[in-house]
């Protein structure tokens, strides 16, 4: 064996489709044989096992408002090539790093709209949940944005609340 063959670590691709819930993401990692069980993944992703993701600005800005899962909406959908011999923290951190990289460019746009990243994540979750099909996302997004920007009293007090995100 060559030296590179001796130290080569096994990798695998893990694909997280858009719209996958945190529980669904955890199940994908379990099914891939990378994590022992769903609860282990979710406890890490939510920080309830002591895992610290404070290196990410977004993590520190997620409100502690009693939501069921802090991680919901932040586990970035992507195809990841990961080492098969890592711990759960590595997998979650990889996804949070991708989320931070992909959303960094949106910070100014989100701030200009007078909202927070957390509200933007919840709105995106609403849109995906309501649309059901990716082809309907634009129509549903326009509808939600029109309602949120409306002066109509029916929508003026609207708060972003979702079973998935709250």
What does each model-found stretch correspond to?
Residues 164-165:
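Low-complexity, Pro/Ser/Thr
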Residues 1-159:
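Conserved catalytic or metal-liganding residues and their short signature motifs at active sites
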């Amino acid at each position: 064996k060559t030296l590179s063959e001796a130290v080569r670590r096994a990798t695998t691709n893990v694909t997280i489709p858009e719209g996958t819930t945190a529980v669904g993401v955890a199940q994908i990692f379990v099914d891939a044989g990378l994590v022992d069980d769903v609860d282990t993944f979710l406890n890490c992703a939510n920080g309830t096992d002591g895992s610290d993701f404070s290196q990410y600005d977004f993590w520190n800005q997620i409100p502690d408002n009693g939501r069921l899962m802090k991680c919901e909406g932040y586990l970035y959908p992507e195809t990841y090539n990961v080492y098969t011999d890592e711990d759960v923290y590595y997998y979650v951190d990889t996804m949070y790093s991708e989320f931070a990289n992909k959303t960094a460019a949106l910070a100014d746009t989100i701030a200009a709209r007078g909202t927070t990243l957390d509200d933007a994540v919840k709105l995106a979750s609403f849109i995906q949940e309501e649309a059901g099909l990716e082809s309907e996302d634009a129509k549903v997004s326009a509808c939600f944005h029109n309602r949120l920007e409306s002066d109509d009293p029916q929508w003026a007090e609207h708060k972003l609340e979702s079973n998935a995100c709250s």
